[in-house]
Amino acid sequence: MRRAALLIFCLLSAGAQAPEGGDTVRLTREPGLSAPARGVLSKLPPGVRAGVLVVDLRTRAVLETQAPDDAFIPASTIKLITASSVLDERGGSSGAWTAELTVPAAQVGRAQVSHLTLRGSGDPTLAVTGAYSLRALAQQAYAHGVRQVGQVRLDQTPLSGAWAQTPLGLPMTALRLAEWRVRPPATAAEAQARLGAALVQELRRAGISVASAQIGRAAPFRPYVPPARTDDQGRPLPPDPWIPLAQRPEQGVASVRSASPARVLAAMLRPSDNLRAEELLATLAHRPGGNGTLAGALARERAWLRRVGVDLRGVRLADGSGLSRENRLTARALVTVLRAQYDLPHPLPGKTGLPGALYRTRGNAFIEALPQAGTGENVPEHDGRGGTLARRLLGAGLDVRAKTGTLPGVSALAGYVTGRSGHPLAFAILMNGPEDAPILTLRALQDELVQELAARY
């Protein structure tokens, strides 16, 4: 009887010591590699190790594993985390970024204003011309009756200089222009000058005169706090609801809305654009909770990963592009992200349906932003539908949508393939080795493994 009581006590104690913070406890034995998969990976060059995880998204079965919880340098597959976090933060593909021009509340309706302030969402898609542009803002301000402006100001909420210390080596600013992709500003001061000059030019083009060529910085918004009031007996009274005009928030005279975030995510993921990836990560710093810092943006990514059930043991995030060799991901972390984007899809505009239907009909915004293998395009910028996978798996007849990753000694592939059963499979293949490891050989083995998976399952 005592032994039975002791056993019960030990079991209860063990339960009380379960891992904290949402750590995953796996009680089922997962399979290793099948013979065909082992045959492929047996051809890895000396010194190269691989982590593999493959899951059937319809049956939830784990199909193949090798070191799924080991941490690897992920290279550009980290962009899957960046894209997922931004898509979630924007509310899916129907969300948007916005920009507006504001004037002091006391000057609303006047033709002459002391200053005009540009405020934005921190995204990289605002352009000089087009629907979501400085030109459209200037034309709206003119239509609103603005004719003379004393000074143009920019709401350049400061972002941490830590981005300049990442391998990309460029500062991130709260207001950016799409045209900077070709020649991005080297400093925050250069960004301020170039953006301000472009806005002044568009205002003048629209018929609005600007007195000062000097670009100002918008004062940070501070909520009005009414003074305390008391009655003639010294007892506190409710605050006066009337806010003096000078203390009221500036009012908008023009606003524009971006296209679907799905478009810029595709423009980042398909060609594996490092600058766009860091710009998109910076939007998470710009939003409340990001604190204007790289660390704040990465913390928001980790928070999203926790929400979708990613086991964060071994995971380390250092940037948004994957250029940093300080990043670490596991195959399990990547497959959990892929599974979450399949199970909880963000439909493209005009698309509806359950996860399987959206996958089949090309309606899942995240999955459709990925490179598609074997499209055959041969474009130098990798900006076609196939992106960095356009020339891989040519003629294989497979439906593969996945993200590549490459650094010296690092090659990775993570995404989706439709198996012969018709089931969608989520897979992650991470390979790390010496910096002189033959990357083309690693890619060829990844492609061979994906073909084996599709044929077997």
What are these regions (language model features)?
Residues 1-20:
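Secretory targeting and sorting signals
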Residues 19-73, 97, 137-146, 294:
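Beta-lactamase-like hydrolase cores
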Residues 60, 74-93, 198-199, 268, ...:
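Active-site SXXK
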Residues 63-65, 286-457:
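Small-residue-rich helix-loop
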Residues 88-106, 212-217, 366:
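Short, well-structured active-site flanking segments
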Residues 99-103, 111-205, 257-300:
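Active-site-adjacent helix/loop patches that line small-molecule binding or acyl-intermediate pockets
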Residues 102-107, 252, 411-420:
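Short, surface-exposed beta-strand/loop micro-motifs that present aromatic residues
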Residues 182-364:
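A small/polar active-site loop signature that marks catalytic segments
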